[in-house]
Protein backbone atom coordinates (compact mmCIF):
# COMPACT_ATOMS: atom_id res chain seq x y z
CA UNK A 1 0.00 0.00 0.00
CA UNK A 2 2.71 2.52 0.96
CA UNK A 3 4.90 1.28 -1.90
CA UNK A 4 2.08 2.12 -4.32
CA UNK A 5 2.39 5.73 -3.16
CA UNK A 6 6.19 5.72 -3.45
CA UNK A 7 6.61 5.68 0.34
CA UNK A 8 8.42 2.52 1.45
CA UNK A 9 7.95 1.50 5.08
CA UNK A 10 11.24 1.47 7.03
CA UNK A 11 11.73 0.29 10.59
CA UNK A 12 14.49 1.89 12.66
CA UNK A 13 16.17 -0.67 14.92
CA UNK A 14 16.93 1.28 18.07
CA UNK A 15 18.03 0.65 21.62
CA UNK A 16 15.17 0.87 24.09
CA UNK A 17 12.64 -0.54 21.60
CA UNK A 18 11.41 -4.04 20.82
CA UNK A 19 13.85 -4.35 17.88
CA UNK A 20 17.35 -3.58 19.11
CA UNK A 21 19.61 -6.65 19.01
CA UNK A 22 20.95 -8.53 16.02
CA UNK A 23 18.57 -11.39 16.82
CA UNK A 24 15.65 -8.93 16.97
CA UNK A 25 16.59 -7.56 13.54
CA UNK A 26 16.84 -11.09 12.10
CA UNK A 27 13.43 -12.02 13.49
CA UNK A 28 11.86 -8.78 12.25
CA UNK A 29 13.26 -9.22 8.76
CA UNK A 30 12.14 -12.87 8.67
CA UNK A 31 8.61 -11.92 9.74
CA UNK A 32 8.15 -9.12 7.20
CA UNK A 33 8.12 -9.10 3.43
CA UNK A 34 10.30 -7.41 0.83
CA UNK A 35 8.15 -4.27 1.00
CA UNK A 36 9.29 -3.58 4.57
CA UNK A 37 12.71 -2.00 4.82
CA UNK A 38 15.26 -1.51 7.56
CA UNK A 39 16.68 1.80 8.66
CA UNK A 40 20.20 0.60 9.42
CA UNK A 41 21.81 2.41 12.37
CA UNK A 42 25.47 1.60 13.00
CA UNK A 43 25.60 3.18 16.45
CA UNK A 44 22.57 1.39 17.83
CA UNK A 45 23.68 -1.94 16.38
CA UNK A 46 27.13 -1.57 17.90
CA UNK A 47 25.62 -0.54 21.23
CA UNK A 48 23.55 -3.75 21.08
CA UNK A 49 26.85 -5.60 20.47
CA UNK A 50 25.55 -6.79 17.11
CA UNK A 51 27.71 -7.80 14.19
CA UNK A 52 26.71 -4.68 12.27
CA UNK A 53 28.72 -5.70 9.20
CA UNK A 54 26.82 -9.02 8.98
CA UNK A 55 23.48 -7.23 9.38
CA UNK A 56 24.37 -4.89 6.52
CA UNK A 57 25.49 -7.75 4.25
CA UNK A 58 22.42 -9.86 5.02
CA UNK A 59 19.82 -7.15 4.52
CA UNK A 60 21.38 -4.68 2.08
CA UNK A 61 18.60 -5.30 -0.45
CA UNK A 62 16.06 -4.20 2.18
CA UNK A 63 17.94 -1.22 3.60
CA UNK A 64 16.85 2.16 2.30
CA UNK A 65 18.20 4.48 4.96
CA UNK A 66 21.52 4.43 6.83
CA UNK A 67 22.26 6.37 10.01
CA UNK A 68 26.02 6.79 10.31
CA UNK A 69 26.53 7.13 14.02
CA UNK A 70 29.63 6.23 15.98
CA UNK A 71 30.44 5.07 19.51
CA UNK A 72 32.95 6.45 21.97
CA UNK A 73 34.57 3.19 22.98
CA UNK A 74 35.69 4.36 26.43
CA UNK A 75 32.18 5.53 27.33
CA UNK A 76 30.68 2.33 25.90
CA UNK A 77 33.03 0.06 27.88
CA UNK A 78 32.38 2.04 31.06
CA UNK A 79 28.63 1.71 30.43
CA UNK A 80 28.99 -2.07 30.24
CA UNK A 81 31.30 -2.24 33.26
CA UNK A 82 28.97 -0.07 35.37
CA UNK A 83 25.82 -1.80 34.01
CA UNK A 84 24.34 1.52 32.90
CA UNK A 85 21.02 1.74 31.11
CA UNK A 86 20.85 2.87 27.50
CA UNK A 87 19.53 6.25 28.66
CA UNK A 88 22.37 6.71 31.15
CA UNK A 89 24.91 5.74 28.48
CA UNK A 90 23.35 8.17 26.04
CA UNK A 91 23.46 10.99 28.60
CA UNK A 92 27.11 10.14 29.32
CA UNK A 93 27.96 10.73 25.65
CA UNK A 94 28.30 7.22 24.24
CA UNK A 95 27.36 8.38 20.72
CA UNK A 96 29.31 10.62 18.38
CA UNK A 97 29.79 11.19 14.66
CA UNK A 98 31.81 8.98 12.31
CA UNK A 99 35.48 9.80 12.59
CA UNK A 100 35.27 10.56 16.31
CA UNK A 101 34.51 7.05 17.53
CA UNK A 102 35.63 3.46 17.07
CA UNK A 103 33.57 2.21 14.10
CA UNK A 104 35.58 1.66 10.92
CA UNK A 105 33.21 2.71 8.17
CA UNK A 106 35.45 1.66 5.27
CA UNK A 107 34.20 -1.96 5.10
CA UNK A 108 30.60 -0.76 5.43
CA UNK A 109 31.00 1.80 2.63
CA UNK A 110 32.61 -0.92 0.50
CA UNK A 111 29.54 -3.15 0.98
CA UNK A 112 27.22 -0.26 0.11
CA UNK A 113 29.27 0.48 -3.02
CA UNK A 114 29.46 -3.15 -4.15
CA UNK A 115 25.68 -3.44 -3.79
CA UNK A 116 25.18 -0.14 -5.65
CA UNK A 117 23.39 1.45 -2.71
CA UNK A 118 21.85 4.78 -3.77
CA UNK A 119 19.52 5.57 -0.88
CA UNK A 120 19.75 7.79 2.20
CA UNK A 121 23.01 8.04 4.12
CA UNK A 122 23.05 10.55 6.97
CA UNK A 123 25.46 11.61 9.70
CA UNK A 124 23.96 11.33 13.16
CA UNK A 125 25.48 11.97 16.54
CA UNK A 126 22.82 11.98 19.29
CA UNK A 127 24.97 14.03 21.61
CA UNK A 128 24.53 17.03 23.87
CA UNK A 129 25.05 20.22 21.81
CA UNK A 130 26.33 21.97 24.95
CA UNK A 131 29.21 19.48 25.09
CA UNK A 132 29.77 18.87 21.37
CA UNK A 133 29.27 21.78 18.98
CA UNK A 134 26.88 20.47 16.27
CA UNK A 135 28.59 22.27 13.38
CA UNK A 136 32.05 21.17 14.47
CA UNK A 137 30.94 17.55 14.78
CA UNK A 138 28.98 17.66 11.52
CA UNK A 139 32.20 18.73 9.79
CA UNK A 140 34.16 15.90 11.45
CA UNK A 141 31.55 13.37 10.29
CA UNK A 142 31.32 14.84 6.81
CA UNK A 143 35.08 14.87 6.30
CA UNK A 144 35.47 11.30 7.54
CA UNK A 145 32.60 9.88 5.47
CA UNK A 146 33.54 11.92 2.39
CA UNK A 147 36.99 10.36 2.43
CA UNK A 148 35.58 6.84 2.89
CA UNK A 149 33.02 7.38 0.12
CA UNK A 150 35.59 8.78 -2.32
CA UNK A 151 37.87 5.78 -1.64
CA UNK A 152 35.03 3.67 -3.09
CA UNK A 153 34.41 5.97 -6.06
CA UNK A 154 31.18 7.40 -4.72
CA UNK A 155 30.53 10.94 -5.92
CA UNK A 156 29.12 13.52 -3.56
Feature map (PLM): residue ranges:
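Residues at the N-termini of beta-strands
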Residues: 65, 119-120
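Acidic/histidine-rich catalytic cores of soluble enzymes
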Residues: 1-98, 156
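A structural motif corresponding to the C-terminal end of an alpha-helix
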Residues: 1-9, 107-118, 148-155
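Short active-site-adjacent structural elements
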Residues: 75-76, 129-132
